[in-house]
């Protein structure tokens, strides 16, 4: 293991990020944190997300406290990897990017047309910054790190996970390929609103293309997001 064993996995919504967190949590050498900047994001933006008050009560709303914990707090006994699932849009401009330097960064991406097709069922009129691809491109430009495309991950999990572990300089563990169903103590308090399918899962579901075409009204938004996605996609591991 390199000196830094703290992994920050950056993604937008609807990218199988929680399933990937499950894969890491199923390793005996890893502890996970679920979206530690979420309360900060909600407190600063004033957005009315499901369970907003619960989220804000469950975490620090000071990004300095959050990142000090993520970069400096001791890992539990017997654990050598700290893995944090981060939403890219939670990283607001006021957060000092230098505070993220001790972390080992990685990225999970999804074709914006597929992402929008799923996300629009929850929020009918999303905006560019809701999807996080612009912010993710900025994080990638600053810190680099391996890139995983969610379609590749679902289509053939083991080789993609092996390549990801290799890129992060940690050993692959077959425990990442499946996990027991149900909730986890590590799940954020927002889990009842978002995690039903993950709670029912025991592994990565096979890739399936969207059943319906992207609504025409969302095509311009997908086109705006596409260059950010393509920027990261060219570096994806396989």
Identify the meaning behind each predicted range.
Residues 84-175, 192-195, 200:
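PAPS-dependent sulfotransferase catalytic domain
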Residues 77, 139-145, 228-231:
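A structural motif corresponding to the C-terminal end of an alpha-helix
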Residues 27-30, 80, 102, 144:
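A generic structural signal for alpha->beta connector loops
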Residues 1-7, 174-238:
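PAPS-dependent sulfotransferases, especially Golgi type II membrane carbohydrate sulfotransferases
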Residues 40-42, 115, 182:
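Generic structural signal for helix capping and beta-alpha/helix-loop junctions
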């Amino acid at each position: 293991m390199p000196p830094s064993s703290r992994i920050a996995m950056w993604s937008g919504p609807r990218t199988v990020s929680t399933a990937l967190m499950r894969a890491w949590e199923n390793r005996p050498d890893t502890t996970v944190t679920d979206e530690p900047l979420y309360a900060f994001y909600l407190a600063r933006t004033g957005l009315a997300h499901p369970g907003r008050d619960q989220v804000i009560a469950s975490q620090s709303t000071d990004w300095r406290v959050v990142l000090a914990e993520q970069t400096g707090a001791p890992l539990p006994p017997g654990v050598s990897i700290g893995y944090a699932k981060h939403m890219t849009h939670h990283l607001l401009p006021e957060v000092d990017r230098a505070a993220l330097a001790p972390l080992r960064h990685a990225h999970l991406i999804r074709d914006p047309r597929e992402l929008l097709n799923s996300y629009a069922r929850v929020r009918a009129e999303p905006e560019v910054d809701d999807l996080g691809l612009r912010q993710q491109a900025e994080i990638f430009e600053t810190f680099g790190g391996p890139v995983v495309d969610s379609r590749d991950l679902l289509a053939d999990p083991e080789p993609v996970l092996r390549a990801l572990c290799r890129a992060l300089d940690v050993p692959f563990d077959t425990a990442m390929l499946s996990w027991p169903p149900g909730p986890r103590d590590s799940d954020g308090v927002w889990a009842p609103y978002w995690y039903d399918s993950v709670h029912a899962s025991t592994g990565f579901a096979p890739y399936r293309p969207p059943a319906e075409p992207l609504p025409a009204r969302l095509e311009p938004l997908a086109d705006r997001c596409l260059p950010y996605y393509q920027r990261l996609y060219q570096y994806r591991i396989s």
